[in-house]
Amino acid sequence: AARPYVTRLSSSGYIDEMANGQLCVVMGYSGDINIARQRAIDGKTGQKIEAQIPSTGGLLFFDVMVIPADAPHADNAHKFINYILRPEVHASLTNKVFYANPNAAALKFVKKDVAENTTIFLSDADKKLMHAPDSLPQPIKRVQTRVFTSFKAGR
């Protein structure tokens, strides 16, 4: 069983801990792992960090921006979204958080090393391995939560 060898389950703080060499293995978001990699390089910590795509594939998530139908300042929301969609701005976000964006006009502003990172901009072969998370029925979600809670508790 793997659980006795797991020292902590956390979704916060692991970026800096990874960059500083305090963790040996992490299951996390590719953007977070690439941020840790860059921090290790910038901080000259000596840590070699690589995001990896499992050979069996993985989940593909998307961030979206929405405006509620009853938003009191919808015009401002549209202005903000239009600002984010400016190629230079969209590219600066990709360069900072290491997530691809769908804005083709932004690609020319993405740093070369970021644009060539295949855990950020997936190859066609890797794209075929990825899938959206399944929408699970409520009873399955309850079982999933119970099992994960038990695992975290060390049982």
What are these regions (language model features)?
Residues 1-54:
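Ligand-binding pocket segment of bilobal, Venus flytrap-like solute-binding proteins
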Residues 5, 19, 23, 38, ...:
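Sec-exported extracytoplasmic/periplasmic mature domains
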